[in-house]
Design a protein with these regions (language model features):
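Acetyl-CoA-dependent GNAT
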Residues: 1-82, 87-88, 100-102, 106, ...
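Conserved catalytic-core motifs of GNAT/GCN5-like acyltransferases
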Residues: 8, 116-121, 127, 131-132, ...
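Active-site acidic-Proline motif in GNAT/NAT acetyltransferases
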Residues: 87-89, 93, 121
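Conserved amphipathic alpha-helical interaction elements at protein-protein interfaces in regulatory
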Residues: 92, 105-109, 132, 136
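Residues forming the Rossmann-fold NAD(P)(H) cofactor-binding site
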Residues: 93, 97, 101
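Accessory recognition modules or surfaces
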Residues: 97, 149-158
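Conserved GNAT acetyl-CoA-binding A-motif
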Residues: 100, 107-119
Length: 183
């Protein structure tokens, strides 16, 4: 397995985005209506990653885009996770956790202070991933901030257990490995 940085408009990114949107339709009755501009994922203000198997098949994706304070509830220094997705055939192998760790590392290196994401109650596996990775609930933000089924989480990227926006803070596991399946 290897992780590759690609543009959000890359053909593999587009194909994976179609798959995640189809899954949103299955779970919620519609796709994600959050406005997304491909340029938001261009370094150093964002990144988009794809995990490939040894044969070059795309298995998982995720990106972050820099967000700062404004009317939608963001804070200065936020990195918002978008389009985290693992194809069904590759689920349960730690790929989402691998992508999330790589996104955190990239956002930290870009000077972002907090990683945030929004998910919904119909994605309990996503909520489980984020909470088991040290994310805690934060005030709602973004397009779905008024949706009752929306859940927002955050994690400080400073490495010092700093504030995630809810006053509780979070620590990052410094021993996290980048190899899939490693202990």
């Amino acid at each position: 397995m290897h992780i590759r940085t690609v543009g959000y408009g890359h053909p593999d990114a587009v194909a994976l985005d179609r798959e995640v949107q189809a899954e949103y339709v299955e779970r919620y009755g519609e796709g994600d209506t959050t406005p997304v501009d491909a340029a938001q994922f261009d370094p150093p203000h964002g990144i988009y990653l794809i995990v490939y198997d040894p044969d070059g098949t795309p298995l998982a994706s995720g990106g972050w885009r820099g967000r700062d304070s404004g009317e939608e509830g963001y804070a200065d220094g936020d990195a918002e996770v978008k389009r985290m997705f693992v194809v069904r055939a590759a689920r349960g192998r730690g790929l989402a956790r691998l992508v999330l760790a790589a996104l955190e590392d990239s956002a930290r290196a870009a000077g972002r202070r907090r990683m945030i994401m929004e998910t919904g109650t119909r994605q309990p596996e996503a909520i489980g991933l984020y909470t088991s990775s040290g994310y805690t609930p934060v005030p709602k933000f973004g397009v779905y901030r008024f949706d009752e089924g929306s859940r927002c989480f955050g994690k400080a990227l400073s490495g010092d257990g700093g504030d995630t926006g809810d006053g509780r803070g979070a620590d990052r596991d410094p021993g996290r490995t980048r190899a899939v399946g490693a202990p």
